[in-house]
């Protein structure tokens, strides 16, 4: 399911985005952010992170560097090390 959700993002990035001027106020771009968020966090959490990011991408936001949050690690694996 995750890979299926990434197909429209890839299509946009490689087929449609080059035809339009860059409008994203953030780095990485919103499409790169969405791809990475879904790839790292899964469809539900990554999709939610992507929607929140798109909501922040508007002319009144200063933009800037906004990376995808790191994947949380479980406490048991960090205690075992």
From Swiss-Prot:
Membrane topology classification: Peripheral membrane protein
A Pfam family assignment: YidD
Keywords: Cell inner membrane, Cell membrane, Membrane
GO cellular component, one term: plasma membrane
SMART domains found in the cross-reference section: Haemolytic (SM01234)
tRNA processing as UniProt keyword: no
Annotated InterPro entries: Membr_insert_effic_factor_YidD (IPR002696)
Subcellular location: Cell inner membrane
Superkingdom of the source species: Bacteria
Keyword Membrane included in the entry's annotation: yes
Its job: Could be involved in insertion of integral membrane proteins into the membrane.
Similarity-based family: Belongs to the UPF0161 family.
Stored HAMAP family: UPF0161_YidD
Protein name in UniProt: Putative membrane protein insertion efficiency factor
Organism: Pseudomonas savastanoi pv. phaseolicola (strain 1448A / Race 6)
């Amino acid at each position: 399911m995750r890979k299926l959700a990434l197909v429209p993002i890839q299509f946009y990035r490689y087929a449609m985005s080059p035809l339009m001027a860059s409008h994203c106020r953030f780095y990485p771009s919103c499409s790169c952010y969405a791809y990475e968020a879904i790839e790292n966090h899964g469809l539900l959490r990554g999709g939610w992170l992507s929607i929140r990011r798109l909501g922040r991408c508007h002319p009144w936001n200063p933009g800037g560097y906004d990376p995808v949050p790191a994947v949380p690690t479980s406490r048991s694996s960090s205690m075992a090390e």
